[in-house]
Amino acid sequence: MNNSNNSQSLYQSLWNAADILRGKMDANEYKSYLLGLIFYKYLSDKLLLAVCDNLDESFDSLSQAQRLYEENFADPDVKEDLLDVLDDELGYFIEPGLTFTALVAKVHTSNFQLEDLAQGFRDIEQSNEIFENLFEDIDLYSKKLGPTPQKQNQVISALIKELHELNLSNHDGDVLGDAYEYLIGQFASDSGKKAGEFYTPQAVSHLMTQIVFLGREHQKGMTLYDPTMGSGSLLLNAKRYSKESSTVSYFGQEINTSTYNLARMNMMLHGVAIENQKLHVGDTLDADWPTTEPTDFDGVLMNPPYSQKWSGDAGFLQDARFSSYGVLAPKSKADFAFLLHGFYHLKHSGVMAIVLPHGVLFRGNAEQKIRQHLLEEGAIDTVIGLPANIFYNTSIPTTVIILKKNRTSKDVLFIDASKEFDKGKNQNIMTDDHIAKILKAYQDRQDVDKFAHLASFEEIVENDYNLNIPRYVDTFEEEPVIPLTELADKLAQTDEEIAATTAQLEAMLGQLVGTTPEAQAELTASDCRQTSFWCLSFLLFLEKNGCFN
């Protein structure tokens, strides 16, 4: 079986484990249980591997590794050495009796207690600052798991048994990370509108990340920043497009603690070193972060909540992020507040990509003044119109805006990718081919009929700094011209068909009315049904031929 099939098998097995919780709570809730337990198993299996590696012991199964751990931990001298090694290499520690493998053994002998798992969670959370409160969203005693402690125990036991069948130690960090990302996407699909707070569709993530990394694939020590990071998927795509991904540093902030915990797990499952991730929980607009070095970044990637309300207090006019613009984003729409925050933290040589609703391109008043200021600075490099209905939390079309600080030109490239999608079951889907077409237009920076236009600054000024894409990219498709003789022939043919159908209908109506009381009495239900059919057929025929337009 090839790696692709292995990955798909792992994805499906992990998703099937959700069946145990599905129906007890919605996807937005049960994702914490499944993802949290997968992460606990990952940490546990990784610990057993580290123990055996440091003891220079080989093993054939996790159960054998568990026995080696228990035996050596019982020796006081070996125990102290192991604790030092685990703290140094992993940054966390799990008691031998609380590893995932040990919990499975307890489940099989009916000795498992929820407190065992709860204690394991606490041990990890207290072992290192980076794990603090990591499992706080997993309520092992929730009534949604079952009405009694016994029922709750049974559900968690079943989930532990299901996940134990998967040997996560057989997969490298990228496969596990991708599997985790797959699950997050599946949860987003199941969660619908609730998903917007934690997930950016992979196609959009790939497009934005590739743009940020264009020409910098081999740059070492790249710094990336996402102040509305959700699950961290935008940041983590750097592992695909950087040739020096092990040197990339990730900076992210998230206001929702549950989503923040999800991002932390996602980072670690993707193999991002602890020293390369600086994640923070907080309100991006109300309290700027980071405020200590580094405060500007090579790449800024953002998919903020759309048209969200914010305080917009006049005091923000003195905030370095907004002060040079003279106005603030409207209190009812924080879109430009998020954009200016990200742009403030962009290096002079950096690239920023942000997803926003189309309204930011043309709304007036304060937003127009901010837009004008950015355009006069040459900050707006490219505007890409995405298809409608590609996000889980909204069906509206969105736009990706690319910003830079070191441009010498004020022109703007417009790309209308609104038709670049395939129809999916619930959402429209952008494929690799669609993304490649957009990237080519972005790199070529030339006009493409009905797809892209490079607008001069003078053209934008003439449009009063309105960046609405249809003003610059004409996608109108003209109807083919039909010769008058051909049109006349079609009309004559249609008239003949209408006349024939009318005659048939009149004959049927004549049968329906009857000429004598006796004839009327002979009408049958079959006659009525047949006449109704002809009436309906006639109406459909008229509609098809445009008689109701």
Q: What annotation goes with each model-predicted range?
A:
Residues M1-V212, E275-T284, G385-A388, K410-S418, ...:
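Non-catalytic, mostly N-terminal accessory regions of nucleic-acid modification and defense proteins
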Residues K194-M302, S307-F316, F322-Y325, F336-A337, ...:
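Conserved S-adenosyl-L-methionine
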